C-alpha cells in the first residue's frame, strides 16, 4: 500500500507545485502589463534594452535570414518550375518570409540569443542579492529591472523580424535573379502585386509582437524565479530556450489558424 500512496503523494505534490508556478507566472505577467505605462516613462532605460537585445541578436538574425533566403530561392524556383510558374518566385519568397518564417525563425533565434542573456542577467542579479537589496531600499525590482527589459524585448523582436524578412528577400533575389537567371522585373512585380500590406505584412507584425512578448516574458520569469546559485542560473537559461521555443511553435499554429479563418 505504501508504494501507491507514495506515488500518489508525489503526483499531488508535482501538480500542486505546477499550479503554484503557473499562478506566480500569471501574477508576474499581470504586474508587467500594469507597469508598462510607467516603464514607457523611463524611455532611456527602455531604449538601452532595445539596443542591448537588438545588438545581441542582429548579426545572427541577418546571417540566418540571408541563408534562409538562399534556400527559399533555390527550393522555390525548382518547385515552381515544374508547373511553369517560376516567375512567381518573388511572391513565394516574400510571403513565406513575411507571414511565417520571418517571425518564427527570428523568435527562435531571439530566444536562444537574447532570451538566455536576459535570464542569465536577472539570475545573476538574484544570486548576487541585488534584487533583494532593491526591496530593502523600497525599490520594486519588477518595475525597475524587469519592466524596461520586457518593453525592450517587445519592441526589439518586431524590428529583428523585419530585418530577417528583408535580408531573406534579398537572399532569394540574389539566388533567383543573379544565380539562376529569373527575370528581375517579374521577381519584383509579382512580389509587389501579390503581397497585401494589411493582411500579409500585418499578420507577420502581429506574430512577431506576440512572439516577442512570449519569449521576453519566459526569459524574465525564469531568471526571476531561478535558484540563486550558478547551477540554478544554468538550469534557468536552458528552460528559457526550451519553454520559449515550444511556446512560439504552439502560438504560431494558433495564430495561423486564426488568421486564415478571418
Residue ranges: model-predicted function:
Residues 38-63, 242-245:
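Membrane-interface helix starts
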